[in-house]
Amino acid sequence: MGASIAVTADGRDEWIEARETLHAHGSVLVHGRLPDWRPQAADNETLSTAVGGGRTGRRQLAHAAARERRAASHLLLGHAVAVALCTDVAEIELTRGPTGRPAVRGCDQIDISLSHTADLLLVGLTTRGLIGVDAEPADRRLRAAGLERRVCTVRERGDLDALPPRERASGLLRLWTLKESYTKAIGQGQRFPFDAFGFGPEGEPVRVHRPDGTPATGSEWSFRSDIRYVHGVAFRMSAAVRDVGLGRTTDIDVATTLDAGIVSTVQEALDGWE
């Protein structure tokens, strides 16, 4: 899985690169900035719903900002899916599956995931099986009391303790985003206890481990986690992909994914009802 590709709504070359990457490797990550993907029609509404004073106004502003990021991330996701399927974004209908994972209605040849934080929007696409992505500002500090015990295995806590003090926060953030990505891919999210599985330290091949550190998954899972700079701001981006073993789908264009023979048979049956 390659590094995430920066994209804009009116870009061309980067979208060609994204589509070629998806076709060549079966998975692709793309990211954008909120200012580039903010839905124009929602600007005034977002601002008006955020107006207020004191604590209530601050809460409304926070909620409005979250809604704006969510709307922008869905706009980016729709564009990414449209490019992948060689269709118009107006033809894409996003929905959610039984576990709450985002999906493309009527299109099971591609799996999708998204994450948004601050001004960053991150989207993952795969034709191999399942995908989950997560992103956080690289300087975020996970400070909640006892957090490491709630989200890390004993083995992971030992690995973190072995790091120089200045690197522990970054190490914990890496684990957090990997766990978010993995549980998003399997459709569980934070419902799945984060201390029930783990990952090895940075520098080792990334694999899911049991709490005792023994491998829990094999080569069907692939991961990526790195720090990327977006307009001078560092973000930790992580992704998890599960290859379900059905082979890589190379033709996912909307116009060609239906078998011509099947279409002809269905059409003949429909004509017979007239």
Task: Describe each region flagged by the PLM.
Residues M1-E274:
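Core catalytic alpha/beta fold that binds nucleotide/phospho-ligands
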